[in-house]
Structure formats: structure tokens, C-alpha cells
């Protein structure tokens, strides 16, 4: 549960007309400095987007840079005629989800799902224990949802961990994240590990036929519900995007003899954009977060825009000003020294505080952190949140606009998901404004984000359906089309 979920807000009627309070000189000077560091002017948006476009092109060659542009091997999108029952498996950090999706065509579907807790010991145990547990959950689910069914059921596996994907059904784990630390999986293809476990538990009527990321599922599910969607994006705890590309535009795949006008969904994996620190305007707070992270020097773009980091940026700003004697008047700040003390929901709550004197923010700091705040301090904190949130949205827009420019389309529907996009106040409006600032009013206003369908559930089932229809490339098919 987030801090925002756990916090009980006052029930009295809000009254916010805008505060006329003036900050003292010290706080105002600090605010001016923050505004200079965090404001992303239009000229900088253009430079970041230009750099992004060049990295997209580079990633499609045999010598990619910071944005690897990973082929998903999905060569088609839903055409509305998909029908049938498909399974989906979503392996998260704390839960395992199994879904049965009845695909009904024309954007319609019916979903039944169950969640299973992942015991902590499985996340640090053996690979057999993990995959046997997953297979057993699938078996129990199938017995409940499809009792007595003997014919094979295809299952799509949403495996949102860094992978090298060699075909739709062959993905090797590069490195565990999300608290997993299991020997014998990194460097291995996860498909055979799951298939072997299904056999061990006697689940013989389930066939794994597709492995995908949640971002890929987001695009496919959104395209099914809203035909014409050609980009899928996640702005949540992390960030990523995928899009539909022409085979002729992917030089690193020209060793295969596929038609040049064939489409392929490309998974950008753009969290590492600008690891060389050429254009992104990092502050000292961004640098500190990077240096103290488990992967210093990597994920530069993600660390500036993703929900996993926004709360920590605010926390570091407040501690910095406390150390300089500008905030909290010598109070005990032990609670905000905890690196996990602030998540993005704290910024959201402060930005939507409806009271003129920011009463809810005052109560939040007193009850959660044991800190009394003056109205001046609360106004400063609120403005800091706005700066952090706005920077996130504007830099997020650069990646989307780079894809729009790369695809050279006059308009674009973007299936979008993630907690920041769905829950952060004014993020969508700030994103839309940045589209116009980057692409111009005419084109920018035609880049439309829509709430995505369930990518890791419905999307995985649909990818499984696409594979069954020959719209995704297996290892055998790729071997047949490899040029001599």
C-alpha cells in the first residue's frame, strides 16, 4: 500500500483560491535555483528529441547504442477476426497472475484471472522450485477454469525482465531484477524452463508459444481495442516503449529474406537513453541517485522520469535544504533520511492538495514524517513537486515524439499505461503540451494517448493468438528464412 492509499485525508470542504503568501528570500533563492535546474525549455526538448531519433536509428543497425531496439518477432497486429481461448502468464515482483482470455473478435474479450503470491524464499531459491511453483499455479488455474479440457491451450508469457529475444518463443534472461536472485537462470532461455516444469507437474495440455514484455503486450492489446494504435508506452515505476516498424528499416534483420514491407514490432528498451550524458540535463540530485543505485551509469533516462525515482528526487531536495538550514528549522529528519521514505504518491498528494494553505500537506508531513511545516515551506515543497512532475512529463514526451518522427506519420494513437500516466496529477496534460512544443501545434495535437488495455494479461493472450495464426516468428521459421 502506498503512503497516499494509507493516508486518511480531512473531510472538510476544500477552499483553494491560490495562496498569496510570499516566500522568504532564502526559500525564494532556492526555488529560483530549482526552477533553473528542472525547467525544460522548448529548445532543450528539441535537442533531446533530435538525439533520441538518432539513437532509434542506430539501435536498428548491427551496432546499436544506448537504445537497443529489440525485435519482438511479432509481424502482425490483431485484425479483429481473432477468436478462441488463450492463457496468459504474468510474472511480477510480488505476485504471479494467470489469466484465461476468451478472444471474441472486433476488440471484444472476456477475462478470468487469479493472482498467486510469490513467497520470498522462491525468489532466492532454485530455478526448479520457482518454475515448478509457476507451473503448479497454471495447472490449478486451468483445472478451475477449463475443467476436463483435454485439447491444448496456448499460453503467452509476459516476462518483463531484461532478455535477449531470439524468436517469439526463445528469450534468454540477461539479469534478474525486482528482488529475484536465482542461480541457473541468467543466460538461459526461460521458455524451456517453464515447459519442462509444466511436464513435471503433469500440466500436459498447456503449450508455451509466446514470450513478451509488458510493453509489447500493451501495444498489441491497445491495437486490438483501438485499431490504428502503432505505439505502446509505459510510464510507471519504470518506462519503455515499442512501436510498429517496416522490415526494410531494420538493417540488423536484413540477414533474413522477409518482404521489405513486412511489419515488425520493435521493443525500444529505452531506459538507457543518453547514458553518455550528452543532452539530458541532470541535476546533482539525479547524479546522486545514479551513483547510489544498484546500476550506476545505466538507466539514465528512466532515473529522471520514472515513478520509481520521483519521490527520491523530492526527498533529496528537502534533505539538501534542511542541511543548509532552509527547511524544517532544526527538527529531527530521521524519517526522511530513509531512501524509501517518499514514493511518487507523496508528490501526487501534495500537487492535488485543494486547500489554500496546503492543510493536507501539513498533516501528511506531521503524521508520516513527524515534521511541522510553515505555510512558506509547504508552498516551496508544492512547487518542487510541480517542477519534478513537469520535468518527468516533458522528458517522457521526447521519447514518444522521437518515435512519431521516426515513423513519419501525420498523426498517432499511443496506447499508454503505467502508474505515473494513470495516477499522477496533470501528467497527461503536461505530456500533451510537450507534444505540441516538440512537434508543433498541428502535428503535436494529433499525437493522442489512450489508456492501454491490460498488456501483461490480455496482451499476452493476444500475442499467443497471433503466434497461432502465423503472425509471430518462431525459431524454426527464422531458421528457414536465414539467408545463406
Curated annotation (Swiss-Prot):
Binding sites annotated in the UniProt record for ATP: 90-95, 237, 307-308, 344-348, 419-423
Signal peptide annotation: none
GO biological process: canonical glycolysis; fructose metabolic process; glucose 6-phosphate metabolic process; glucose metabolic process; glycolytic process; intracellular glucose homeostasis; mannose metabolic process; pentose-phosphate shunt, oxidative branch
EC number per UniProt: 2.7.1.1
PROSITE patterns linked: HEXOKINASE_1, HEXOKINASE_2
Keywords (A to Z) from UniProt: ATP-binding, Glycolysis, Kinase, Nucleotide-binding, Transferase
Residues of the Hexokinase domain: 25-465
Catalysed transformations (reactions): a D-hexose + ATP = a D-hexose 6-phosphate + ADP + H(+); D-mannose + ATP = D-mannose 6-phosphate + ADP + H(+); D-fructose + ATP = D-fructose 6-phosphate + ADP + H(+); D-glucose + ATP = D-glucose 6-phosphate + ADP + H(+)
Family named by the database record: Belongs to the hexokinase family.
Biological role stated in the UniProt entry: Catalyzes the phosphorylation of hexose (six-carbon sugars) to hexose 6-phosphate. Phosphorylates D-fructose, D-mannose and, to a lower extent, D-glucose. Compared to hxk2, has low affinity for D-glucose.
Designated name of the protein: Hexokinase-1
Protein species of origin: Schizosaccharomyces pombe (strain 972 / ATCC 24843)
Gene giving rise to this polypeptide: hxk1
